[in-house]
Amino acid sequence: MNRSDILIPGDHNVENYLAAIAAVWGEVAPATIAEYARTFGGVPHRSELLRVRRGVKWYNDSIGSSPSRTIAGLKSFDRRVILIAGGYDKHIPYDPLGPVAADTVKTAILMGATGDKIEQAIRACSDLPIVRVKNMEEAVAAANRLAQDGDIVFMSPASASFDMYRNFEERGNHFRRLVMEMEE
């Protein structure tokens, strides 16, 4: 099995697979282990691969409710992503997100009460394209317009959900529904 066989991104997931393999070695056939790695899309709302549509991978990381969680998610990809971020303002600093976004984000689609703070953090380090939207529907539509074959769309808000949703699960489920309803 190669690293590229693991469907979910990130060094931490490679480490998780190595630990799991060690735990079941001799009890589970290597072919079964490899098949699981190739097909497991992740835990809901945690860098969860929702679908590949027209060559674009759509990931739901609604659990990314702080800059540090979004930073960890951004660092797990091997290419720049289209980032959907923003939400309720917990009055935390967004400055650490700027340099990471400068290195890992192709376009940022921002919404919610923290949209301005996230934009300021990014602008302090980069002039990457930023699109402002009012809600998740507009964010998904904008990402769909911008995304090209080979791109990754990563919804990781770096913010709480309470300005638009009851919780991160509701936000993630809404994103999932919008992504899954897009025509092939």
Regions found by a protein language model. Give the residues of each.
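Phosphate-binding loop of NTP-binding sites
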Residues: 145, 163, 176-184
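Nucleotide phosphate-binding/pyrophosphate-handling subdomain across enzymes
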Residues: 2-105
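A structural signal for short, well-ordered beta-strand elements
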Residues: 26, 129-132, 164
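Short beta-strands and strand-loop turn motifs
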Residues: 154-158
